[in-house]
Curated annotation (Swiss-Prot):
CDD domains: trmE, TrmE_N. The gene is mnmE. Binds 1 potassium ion per subunit. This is tRNA modification GTPase MnmE. It comes from the Bacteria. (6S)-5-formyl-5,6,7,8-tetrahydrofolate binds at residues 25, 87, 126, 457. The keyword Chloroplast does not apply. It holds the Pfam family MnmE_helical.
Length: 457
């Protein structure tokens, strides 16, 4: 019986729905043989590898032509999965792609699990775990900078850094073993201790520098979580619609219209801004609105940036003052909306510079984008070309654990602990880093990671 890891799998690799092209993918030992049974055209057994071949998809049981197709034929090992791969390019549409997929399954292929093509690429050594995870980051990237960061990881920038560090740790452990087992001079113990101290500090500095990129990397991957807050009916939803340049939120003069949290993305200087339009934070007896208010408060706590909208045409209210107090953070921008009306707000009572806007007349909206750029990009140097950024929570957690192991080595050295005992923590650091690339990752973790991928990838 062919095991699950080595049978031939099939899946639709393009999004379901109408489109110009649909692709049904096969990977495995029998990919060419199975595809040949549903293809009328050139003999796939004799076509060159990495060739595109015109023909028709047919039902072998009836001879009925299903579609005019182009078949991409790629032979192992020079494929994404390092197996034989067939890609059947059909006209886009749910019916035709699904019919061809069902034919392939009837001819002996198995329906692929989510992420199974990439999993096979990993199991066959085509990519490591960080590169496999980067595949989904490329797919999910919302801006060009997020995409470039993911592509660098896919190309192996993070893998190379981790692998080089693991090799250096291994070399250090080997040298310690040699010095302990075969001492060639009297002060070998002192020299070995100094070697471990020097190398450990070097590894620690490298990993801590990498951790410092985590905040920026996470922003590139997930966006700047931006909560738009303010009391009801000050123009929050109108601001959201203006930034998005489309109508996403209901806008009325009725307080409490936004009853839930609305999330949308907008591209600011190549970095995704995750805009969260919150329900107006106020005391209310309406149960549905009250739930929205509670969610708004939670969004406020988790935000990287707060856009506080105040009504410039009215004096400050107690609610305004409360919002100013609870949103007092470094990355806050106070917006005075409705400046097209007579200004009555007490600007001298506001704690910082404000931006005067009129969402209705689209005035000074560009100043908001410039301020965000100043807060996150210019001051922090958010994106440096060719830099490696940590953006994956799993990677961040593991590197934090690796740094803790190195701290344990240094703490042991300070109290005079024998070097051979400190090898345990240094070895643990090496193993933890291996979990990042997949060299030391448990099977359960690998299965879980690939289950989060989309079907057909």
């Amino acid at each position: 019986m062919i095991t699950k890891e080595f049978d031939t799998i099939a899946a639709i690799s393009t999004p379901l729905g109408e489109g110009a092209i649909g692709i049904v993918r096969l990977s495995g030992t029998d990919a060419f043989a199975i595809a040949s049974t549903v293809f009328k055209g050139k003999d796939l057994a004799t076509v060159p590898s990495h060739s595109l071949n015109y023909g028709h998809a047919i039902d072998p049981a009836t001879g009925q032509v299903l579609d005019e197709v182009m078949i991409g034929a790629m032979r192992s090992p020079k494929t994404f999965t390092r197996e034989d791969v067939i890609e059947i390019n059909t006209h886009g549409g749910i019916a035709v792609t699904n019919e061809i997929l069902q034919l392939l399954i009837r001819q002996g292929a198995r329906m692929a699990e989510p992420g199974e093509f990439t999993k096979r690429a990993f199991l066959n050594g085509r990519v490591d775990l960080t590169q496999a995870e980067a595949v989904m980051d490329v797919i999910r990237a919302k801006t060009d900078k997020a995409m470039h960061n993911a592509v660098r990881q896919l190309d192996g920038s993070l893998s190379q850094l981790i692998n080089d560090t693991r090799q250096e740790i291994l070399n250090t452990l080997a040298q310690v073993e040699v010095n302990i087992d075969y001492p060639e001079y009297d002060d070998v113990e002192e020299a070995t201790t100094e070697l471990v101290r020097e190398k450990t500090l070097q590894f620690q500095a490298l990993l801590e520098n990498l951790l410092r990129t985590a905040r920026r990397g996470k922003i590139l991957r997930e966006g700047i979580a931006t909560a738009i807050i303010g009391r009801p009916n000050v123009g929050k939803s109108s601001l959201l619609n203006n930034l998005l340049r489309e109508e996403k939120a209901i806008v009325t003069d009725i307080a409490g219209t936004t009853r839930d949290v609305i999330e949308e993305y907008v591209n600011i200087k190549g970095v995704p801004l995750k805009l969260i339009d919150t329900a107006g934070i106020r005391e209310t007896d309406d149960i549905v609105e009250k739930i929205g208010v509670e969610r708004s408060k939670k969004a406020l706590e988790e935000a990287d940036l707060i856009l506080l909208v105040l009504n410039a045409s009215e004096p400050l209210t107690e609610q305004d003052r409360n919002l100013l107090a609870i949103s007092d953070m470094a990355n806050r921008i106070v917006l005075l909306n409705k400046t097209d009306l007579e200004e009555q707000i007490e600007v001298d009572q506001l704690p910082e510079d404000v931006i005067r806007i009129s969402v209705l007349q689209n005035q000074n909206i560009d100043q908001i984008e410039e301020k965000i750029n100043q807060l996150f990009f210019e001051n922090a140097g958010l994106v440096e070309q060719d830099a490696t950024y940590l953006s994956n929570s799993r990677h961040i957690s593991l590197i934090e654990q690796a740094v803790q192991s190195l701290h344990a080595v240094n703490d042991g050295l300070k109290v005079g602990m024998p070097v051979d005992l400190l090898q345990v923590d240094l070895t643990r650091c090496w193993q933890i880093l291996g979990e990042i690339t997949g060299d030391a990752a448990p099977d359960e973790l690998i299965t879980q990671l690939f289950s989060q991928f989309c079907l057909g990838k």
